[in-house]
A protein has these predicted regions:
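Enriched for short, Lys/Arg-rich terminal
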Residues: 1-3, 9, 19-25, 60-66, ...
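A general structural signal for well-ordered alpha-helical segments in protein cores
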Residues: 24-27, 46
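A short, surface-exposed loop/turn module that caps and links secondary-structure elements
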Residues: 33-61
C-alpha cells in the first residue's frame, strides 16, 4: 500500500469536479486502485507524461476527466484532476 499525498491544487480540482456534477465514486475507485498498488485496467488509458509534466502519469477517469499523479517509492502524490483544457491549457 502506498502513502497518499494530495496537492493543494488537487483538493481545489476535486471541489470543482464536484461542482461540475462529476461522479466522485469514479475518482475514489481510481485513487483506491493506485494507493493499493494495483495495475490499472486498460480502460484508464494510463500513460507517462512529457514536457513540463515529465515524471508524472495521467489516467483517464472519463474521456475528458483526467488524474495526474506521481509514484515515488512507497508514496503516491495526486497532483491534479480535471478536463484536458483545465490541465494542459497553454
Amino acid at each position: 500500500m502506498r502513502q497518499p499525498e494530495y496537492s493543494g491544487q488537487f483538493k481545489k480540482d476535486v471541489k470543482l469536479a464536484q461542482k461540475r456534477g462529476k461522479d466522485m465514486e469514479k475518482l475514489k475507485r481510481l485513487l483506491a486502485l493506485l494507493i493499493d498498488g494495483h495495475v490499472l485496467p486498460a480502460a484508464y488509458l494510463d500513460h507517462p507524461l512529457k514536457g513540463n509534466w515529465q515524471g508524472y502519469r495521467d489516467a483517464h477517469i472519463e474521456p475528458d476527466w483526467l488524474l495526474i499523479y506521481k509514484i515515488s517509492g512507497e508514496s503516491i502524490r495526486f497532483e491534479r484532476t480535471g478536463r484536458h483544457a483545465d490541465l494542459f491549457a497553454e
